[in-house]
Amino acid sequence: MSNYSVTNIGPLDSWRDHFGGFVPATTRTGRRVVDHELDGDVIGISATAYEPGEQAGYWHSHSEIDEVYLFLEGEGQMGLDDEVIDVHPGTVVQVGTGVMRTWRCKPDSPTQLRWLCIRAGVIPLPAIPDDAVPITDIPMPW
C-alpha cells in the first residue's frame, strides 16, 4: 500500500452540514476535522463554515503548532492578540505559536465564512491538539 490517504469534504455549500470538533466543548455545526479522516500525523486540516454573525466565542493559542488559515468565501474578521484584521476570499493568515486567535463571520457577510485551517508542528500532531490553551476570560474584540 502506498503512503497516502484520500477523503472528500464535499462542495463548499455542504460544509455547514457537518458537525464536528476536537473536544465536546468546541464541537459545533460547520466544523470538520479532516485530518481525523486521513492517515497522516504531522499536518492537520479542518474545514469550517460560519453563518453571518456567528463567532468562535473563545480565544485560543498553541505552544507547539503553527496554523495557516485560507479563507475561501464570505466576509469575516480574525482577532490576533490585540489586533483585528478583516478576512475575505483569498486571505491567507499564518499564525505562530503563542498568538491568541479567534474569528467571526461578519453579520453583514453576503455568504457563510468558509475557510481551511492547516496545522503543523515539529512533532507528530496528536488527534486532539493538547497544546491548545483556551482563553475564556478575555472578551471578543468586536
Which residues does each predicted region cover?
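A short, N-terminal "cap"/entry segment at the start of jelly-roll beta-barrel domains
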Residues: 1-43, 128-142
